[in-house]
């Protein structure tokens, strides 16, 4: 029996080790390929320097996300600071804006942005999310993103949920991470980005026009390891004035 258990454990560890090695190899090849294609003017030495910075950054992100499962709201507010929220709220009230949509990307620690709800008492905060294929991970990240009171809105339910929120008497602030690849049927806007022909999501713009939402870009910067600062940059208070 001991031999059987030992053999099974050894085989499992070998399988896991092989899988991890394969993933790391695949990941490193993708990173190198993307950097070389995006920055054709840089030599291999410069590319490798960017790679090293990226891997350090990514590892910090993983550790920070794990820490989020046990972090207090007080500590979270020390590590993720939103600098000009009072100005934003005053602008929304002055222009009688019920909705504020936030554009941001997968930069710095985007999971920290979900703590925004802790900074906006009296407002309904949330973020649009795409369901993770693995159910256990999906439930884990839903709990992570909702621990400070924010609502995670499934991407396919975005418009329906926002129209429901419009009937409620409160101001709403919702984050859209819009730097992923849209599905083929949603590839309506193309541009040249990082030396690639790139399609962008336009759903946020369309919904903003329907509910007359203010649009802000969330400019996130890393202050030091584990600490971030976000500044809201006004894009427009009147999205209907712009052509599709």
What kind of feature is each model-predicted range?
Residues 1-104, 109, 138-143, 149-150:
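Membrane-anchoring hydrophobic helices of lipid-metabolizing enzymes
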Residues 69-244:
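Soluble catalytic domains of membrane acyltransferases
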């Amino acid at each position: 029996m001991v031999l059987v258990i030992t053999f099974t454990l050894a085989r499992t560890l070998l399988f896991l080790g092989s899988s991890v090695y394969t993933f790391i190899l695949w990941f490193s090849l993708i990173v190198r390929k993307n950097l070389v294609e995006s920055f054709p003017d840089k030599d291999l030495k410069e590319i490798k320097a960017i790679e090293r910075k990226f891997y350090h950054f990514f590892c910090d992100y993983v550790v920070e996300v794990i820490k989020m499962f046990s972090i207090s709201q007080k500590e979270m507010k020390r590590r993720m600071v939103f600098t000009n929220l009072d100005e934003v709220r005053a602008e929304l009230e002055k222009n009688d804006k019920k909705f504020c949509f936030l554009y941001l990307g997968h930069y710095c620690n985007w999971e920290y942005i979900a703590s925004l709800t802790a900074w906006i008492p009296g407002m309904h905060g949330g973020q649009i999310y795409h369901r993770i294929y693995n159910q256990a991970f999906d439930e884990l990240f839903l709990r992570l993103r909702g621990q400070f009171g924010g609502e995670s809105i499934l991407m396919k339910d975005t418009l329906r949920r926002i129209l429901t929120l419009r009937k409620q008497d409160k101001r709403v602030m919702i984050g859209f991470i819009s730097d992923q690849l849209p599905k083929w049927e949603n590839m309506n806007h193309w541009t040249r980005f990082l030396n690639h022909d790139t399609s962008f999501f336009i759903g946020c713009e369309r919904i903003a026009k329907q509910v007359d939402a203010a649009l802000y870009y969330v400019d996130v910067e890393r202050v030091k390891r584990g600490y971030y600062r976000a500044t809201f940059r006004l894009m427009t208070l009147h999205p209907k004035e712009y052509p599709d």
